[in-house]
Amino acid sequence: MIRVDGRTTDQLRDVTIERGWQEHAEGSALISAGRTRVLCAASVTEGVPRWRKGSGLGWVTAEYSMLPRATHTRNDRESVRGRIGGRTHEISRLIGRSLRAAIDLKALGENTIAIDCDVLLADGGTRTAAITGAYVALADACRWLGRPAAIVTSVCAVSVGVVGGVPMLDLAYTEDSTADTDMNVVRTGAGGFVEVQGTAEGTPFERSTLDELLDLAVAGCTRLTEIQNAALAAPPAAGPPAPERAGAGSGSGGKGTGSR
């Protein structure tokens, strides 16, 4: 079956990840998945939330938002509405959980990395693109901090679904909006599942359909991991000055520049 954009059912959209999009961020990446574009920026601060102080563990958190005209019609900023919507909270927590699956919080030390994921253009799969791009920003932030070993595996995500009775990989908006079943799968580069979110919009799906969707997702995540690795293997983009450390290669970094 050929889809509306010419892809086969098991084909990802064209995906690119460009590092260093925000020169002030310790790590940043712009991910494009078809027409969907998400800017991910990782900010490092010394210290951890009050409830984690003295534990020797770091913290990774995430915030997700969408520009007012990322969609077909304008949406007010949530700051103007005076409250954060439930969908935004849900996606922010999903991104944070997914990234923490990729990191050794003890190796991070008592430092916090906050990842801001801003959707510039939405054409389906914004949360999965955010996770995939945010990992690259996180990895660069750990390098900047002098703690690259804190990254223990990669993590990425992709959507799958059933459209017109046919299982498909990486749904665009027109497919997602008419899907019989919609699912988001988060997977590590080591092969573990972090999260599987699936919903039947109408008729319940069979176990065989679930297995087929997971197979599509695994193949898609394998390809996304390759794209992440290729992006991180490229020469690093210019960023803020690295923090001063006690000794080169000691991995004892963790203090910000004090000017941020």
Curated annotation (Swiss-Prot):
GO molecular function term, any single one: tRNA binding
Binding site for phosphate: R87, G125, T126, R127
E.C. number(s) listed in UniProt: 2.7.7.56
Entry keyword annotation includes DNA-binding: no
Reactions that this protein is recorded to catalyse: tRNA(n+1) + phosphate = tRNA(n) + a ribonucleoside 5'-diphosphate
Matching InterPro entries: ExoRNase_PH_dom1, ExoRNase_PH_dom2, ExoRNase_PH_dom2_sf, PNPase/RNase_PH_dom_sf, Ribosomal_Su5_D2-typ_SF, RNase_PH, RNase_PH_bac-type
Compositional bias ranges of the Gly residues kind: 248-260
Protein's UniProt keywords contain Transferase: yes
Keywords, in A-Z order: Nucleotidyltransferase, RNA-binding, rRNA processing, Transferase, tRNA processing, tRNA-binding
GO BP terms: rRNA catabolic process; rRNA processing; tRNA processing
Coiled coil: none
Region of interest (Disordered), residue spans: 232-260
Top-level EC class: transferase
Family that this chain belongs to: Belongs to the RNase PH family.
Known partners and oligomeric status: Homohexameric ring arranged as a trimer of dimers.
Role: Phosphorolytic 3'-5' exoribonuclease that plays an important role in tRNA 3'-end maturation. Removes nucleotide residues following the 3'-CCA terminus of tRNAs; can also add nucleotides to the ends of RNA molecules by using nucleoside diphosphates as substrates, but this may not be physiologically important. Probably plays a role in initiation of 16S rRNA degradation (leading to ribosome degradation) during starvation.
Annotated protein name in UniProt: Ribonuclease PH
Lineage summary: Bacteria, Bacillati, Actinomycetota, Actinomycetes, Frankiales
